[in-house]
């Protein structure tokens, strides 16, 4: 890592604007909530299954106490990455427009670019089958895809729920769906049949969560466009992920020492500053965030790939 020789003056007004920008389509925070740490590199503990071992705890009269020797701790190394994006404005553009409005718009572009990048990183990590063991993933074949009315998505989800319970002794409380996966699931005859029995209306994410006995169902609606803006692509594709997310504590803050499916370790939240170049004729608004997205508990997830035909 190079020397951080130049300190940046943060613009408080634009930083507050950046904090206020949030896209309802982004779901990375649900899977990989932000946990702030002080250093850009370090290690976080990987929790073992020692507490699941069945141990003889009976003790005879005057016998020695039973002893449990803790397993050696395993750690996950991390090194954060800096993400930054600047948007330029020529002084002539500034003269022809409302300065604050242009700066606010440029702040949106810069912060949105970083947020979309984080969403893509999260999707690639969560929906990559290589990140899961054999018991914690399935790729649906032709007859099992949710776009096939004869398939049984409820059974697939039930198997995933049981796989997680066997792995971590907790049932999953969340389901993340790509946008097209949600459409297929919400229109599936078996789901609509459950809806009819319950005498409910349209199958919303909230009703779907109730039917599947989950705390929440989240939909990844974010898209990206090609450089020529000719092609739109779903960030989250056509996959689904059952997972256990540890609820945040009373303060809402997260700690990497708490077991969880995943975390985003961050040194600081997004900040915005301004700098000039080209002899003072171009003013840049720049957004900066330092973080690393980590899948720390793959056993707490169950990936269902290729849900749609």
Show the residue positions of the predicted features.
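Alpha-helical scaffold segments that mediate packing/assembly in large oligomeric complexes
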Residues: 91-171, 179-192, 308-309
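Extended oligomerization regions of viral-like shell subunits
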Residues: 170-261
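Intrinsically disordered, low-complexity linear regions
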Residues: 2-25, 46, 133-134, 138-141, ...
């Amino acid at each position: 890592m190079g020397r951080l020789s130049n300190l940046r003056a943060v613009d408080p007004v634009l930083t507050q604007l950046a904090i206020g920008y949030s896209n309802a389509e982004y779901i990375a925070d649900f899977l990989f909530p932000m946990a702030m740490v002080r250093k850009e590199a370090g290690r976080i503990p990987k929790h073992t299954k020692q507490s699941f071992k069945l141990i003889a705890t009976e003790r005879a009269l005057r016998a020695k106490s039973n002893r449990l020797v803790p397993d050696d701790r395993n750690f996950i190394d991390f090194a954060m990455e800096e993400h930054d994006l600047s948007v330029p404005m020529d002084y002539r553009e500034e003269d022809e427009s409302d300065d604050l409005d242009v700066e606010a718009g440029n702040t949106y572009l810069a912060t949105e670019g970083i947020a979309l990048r984080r969403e893509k990183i999260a999707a690639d990590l969560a929906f990559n089958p290589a990140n899961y063991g054999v018991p914690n993933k399935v790729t649906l074949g032709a007859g099992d895809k949710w776009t096939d009315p004869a398939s049984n998505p409820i059974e697939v989800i039930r198997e995933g729920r049981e796989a997680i319970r066997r792995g971590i002794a907790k049932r999953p409380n969340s389901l993340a769906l790509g946008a097209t996966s949600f459409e297929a699931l919400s229109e599936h005859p078996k789901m609509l049949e459950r809806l009819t029995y319950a005498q409910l209306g349209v199958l919303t994410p909230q009703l779907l969560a109730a039917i599947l006995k989950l705390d929440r169902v989240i939909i990844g609606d974010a898209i990206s466009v090609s450089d020529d803006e000719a092609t739109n692509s779903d960030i989250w594709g056509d996959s689904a992920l059952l997972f256990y997310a540890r609820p945040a504590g009373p303060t809402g803050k997260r700690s990497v020492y708490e077991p969880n499916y995943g975390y985003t370790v961050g040194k600081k939240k997004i900040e915005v500053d301004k700098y000039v170049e080209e002899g003072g004729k171009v003013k840049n608004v720049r957004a900066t965030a330092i973080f690393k997205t980590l899948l720390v508990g793959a056993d707490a997830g169950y990936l269902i790939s290729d849900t749609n035909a």
